[in-house]
Regions:
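N-terminal secretory signal peptides that target proteins for export/translocation
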Residues: 1-6
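Intrinsic structural disorder/low-complexity segments
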Residues: 7-10, 33-35
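Bacterial N-terminal signal peptides
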Residues: 10-23
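Scaffold/interface architecture of coatomer-like assemblies
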Residues: 24-400
Length: 400
């Protein structure tokens, strides 16, 4: 790793949808009923059969910045080209709406010496203080059990007070449980511009793939973009400093062939093309082939425990990268604890650089009888404009 913050900007799977039901998408279909018109009076014993009208609209979060990385306030429909499965779409609207930001704060980190509750609290308060006026915030902590410490509020001082008075240290935090609780909490926030700021190291043991997949499915229904600030790199560095006594002669590496068995099964239903893209991303390649930066301690049990922790943190880094990747967010890997305030500012700026673009898909889904995945591509048509958005979304047939 280099001596500066590692920040990976990610695309996303599962677009923010207005309407639909199913394991991956929230209601994409809005059904209205109207009376069946008739020129003859209807006998009292007969009821007119209602007609269902499905209104389909995709809400697509798009980040727009200029060549210097600053928010571009001049975005117009003619500046963008949206392709769905290669087919150009007609943009109906571009607007900015207040963000709903759920802080999901891991207060465990019992065996990660770099993970401090005070640092997490300061980071969260900094994010809240830097958000745009009108944004609303809620906060969940998980360090044993998942606990709501602040319900939705548009008053930053209220959220900051709750973070100061209620955030407390725990021992073990289970990320899948926290994701499930977050999806429930996000149902109370308006759709279109929902975010999760996840501060964690992934937990004390390797994240179970089945549990993570279940949590991800629920998050897809909540339409949330996840931004991860990970303590994994800081933790690995700190463990090596504490237990460096005899250098490792031959450091262990993860074979490249393990890419398939380690990464891809997290979401076995991912389309093949997407899986290939993710498999070859530089982040995952680095995480899976980088030598564990370890050292042998003279006390073998201590060394073995530290070695296991290094492996766990590194593996969790992979899952967290996937988590951000699948939801259109980013993962930030601070190298120094002193970087956290600036990272909080950058993250708040990222949240508030987002537009909500809407279009009606040319390939309707109201008559679909099975689940399908649609590929998305958002392209800038204007020189100097940089845009980023989700890469696909999953739709299912509407309930009859």
């Amino acid at each position: 790793m280099t001596g500066y913050t590692n920040r990976i900007i990610c695309g996303c799977v599962a677009a923010c949808l207005l309407a639909g039901a199913g394991p991956f998408s929230s209601p994409l279909y809005q059904a209205q009923t109207v009376s069946n018109p008739s020129t003859q009076p209807t006998p009292p014993t007969q009821q007119p059969e209602p007609i269902k009208i499905y209104t389909e609209e995709v809400l697509l979060p798009v980040v727009a910045t200029d060549s210097s990385g600053r928010f571009d306030p001049t975005l117009e429909a003619d500046d963008l080209l949206i392709l769905e499965d290669g087919q150009p779409q007609t943009i109906r609207s571009i607007r900015r709406i207040p963000a709903s930001v759920l802080l999901l704060l891991d207060t465990g980190g019992f065996r990660n010496p770099a993970m401090k509750t005070n640092a997490t609290r300061d980071l969260a308060m900094r994010v809240v203080s830097q958000l745009r006026s009108g944004d609303q915030v809620a906060a969940l902590q998980f360090g044993g059990k998942v606990e709501l410490i602040q319900s939705w509020t548009a008053e930053p001082e209220v959220a900051i007070h709750s973070l100061k008075s209620k955030l407390s240290s725990g021992r073990y935090g289970r990320l899948p449980d926290a994701l499930a609780a977050a999806s429930v909490q996000l149902r109370n926030a308006p759709p279109g511009n929902r975010h999760i700021v996840l501060v964690t190291d992934g937990g004390e043991s390797l994240i179970d793939k089945a549990d993570l997949a279940a949590g991800m499915k629920q998050l897809f229904t909540a339409q949330a973009t996840i931004h991860v600030i990970s303590y994994t790199l800081l933790g690995r560095k700190e463990i090596n400093v504490q237990h460096r006594k005899i250098p490792v002669i031959a450091a262990a590496t993860t074979p490249k062939s393990e890419m398939d068995t380690t990464v891809l099964p997290i979401f076995p239903n991912a389309p093949e093309k997407l899986a290939e893209e993710l498999k070859h991303k530089s982040l995952l390649r680095i995480l899976l082939t980088e030598s564990y930066p370890g050292a042998i301690d003279l006390d073998y049990p201590v060394w073995r425990h530290s070695r296991d922790q290094l492996k766990t943190l590194k593996q969790n880094e992979i899952w967290l990268a996937w988590l951000a990747e699948e939801t259109g967010g980013d993962i930030i890997l601070p190298v120094l604890a002193e970087e956290l305030p600036k990272l909080a500012d950058d993250l708040a700026r990222e949240v508030d650089s987002q537009y909500v673009v809407t279009y009606r898909p040319k390939s309707g889904v109201a008559l679909k009888s099975s689940e399908e995945i649609r590929r998305l591509e958002v392209v800038s048509r204007r020189v100097g404009l940089h845009v980023r958005s989700r890469r696909s979304y999953v739709v299912t047939a509407p309930s009859k």
